[in-house]
């Protein structure tokens, strides 16, 4: 199971929706994507601990996506964080943080590692290029596929010995009464959950190709008017829905809503005409995705 917390879902200037910040949680692994101004305060409102964050990914260096990061790291230090923090982001991120820490006389008392991608036995996190006015990258959070034993099939064949089941799960051949059991005949692939977050982007083929078949696409939907969206390297809800449709995603969350819109009804209706399984990412809400069979 993966839970996506929409901490801040607005864009541009500070507003009631909050500035961009999304946390993805899987079995104790918390990853934060973007860290707009006020993120740590909104996390406290959400009863989420920023001390437990293991990885932070920044999409680009516009202030509404990154200005909350130095303060959060400084607070982690004040609270005596010991665990290393993994950072992903544009090439300017390292210099940006070093400069602020130097000028504010802050010296991190925990390790900060800047990495290009992340992978462990359960998940992998990678980036893809988006179409914004400056260098910008989206993020893919992917749960790895798992192998599951088809217990029902084994029971139908009268096999209940847990030692045999374990050997098959380990990929070993088993012989019983002259019959050879092959692991591939009893293993089911349990598909991992895949989530994509675009950050700021206009609609483009490179994003469509990067997010194909994901379970949840969190896509820029800043404006209603397309001319204004394209002028500033953003998308409208129609664009986001078109990307979702072309990429064959399962669900679409409209994100990075301009503070000029108090009511998102028109935005949502326009998107749902193209891609029905669309919702507006509301601030301080969460979305749960369970692993597929």
From Swiss-Prot:
GO molecular-function term, one example from the UniProt record: zinc ion binding
Binding site for Zn(2+) 1: 60, 62, 132, 200
Protein species of origin: Sulfurisphaera tokodaii (strain DSM 16993 / JCM 10545 / NBRC 100140 / 7) (Sulfolobus tokodaii)
Assembly and binders: Homodimer.
Signal peptide range in chain numbering: none
Function, in words: Zinc phosphodiesterase, which displays some tRNA 3'-processing endonuclease activity. Probably involved in tRNA maturation, by removing a 3'-trailer from precursor tRNA.
Active site: 64
Binding positions for Zn(2+) 2 per the UniProt entry: 64-65, 200, 256
InterPro entries from the UniProt entry: Metallo-B-lactamas (IPR001279), RibonucZ/Hydroxyglut_hydro (IPR036866), RNase_Z/BN (IPR013471)
Reaction(s) this enzyme catalyzes, per UniProt: Endonucleolytic cleavage of RNA, removing extra 3' nucleotides from tRNA precursor, generating 3' termini of tRNAs. A 3'-hydroxy group is left at the tRNA terminus and a 5'-phosphoryl group is left at the trailer molecule
Keyword Nucleotide-binding listed: no
One Pfam family here: Lactamase_B
Cofactor: Zn(2+)
Keyword Zinc on entry: yes
Annotated Gene3D superfamilies: Ribonuclease Z/Hydroxyacylglutathione hydrolase-like (3.60.15.10)
Enzyme class: hydrolase
Similarity field: Belongs to the RNase Z family.
Gene: rnz
Enzyme Commission number(s): 3.1.26.11
Cofactor note: Binds 2 Zn(2+) ions.
Record's protein name: Ribonuclease Z
Domain of life of the source: Archaea
Alphabetized UniProt keyword annotations: Endonuclease, Hydrolase, Metal-binding, Nuclease, tRNA processing, Zinc
SUPFAM superfamilies referenced in this protein's UniProt entry, alphabetically: Metallo-hydrolase/oxidoreductase
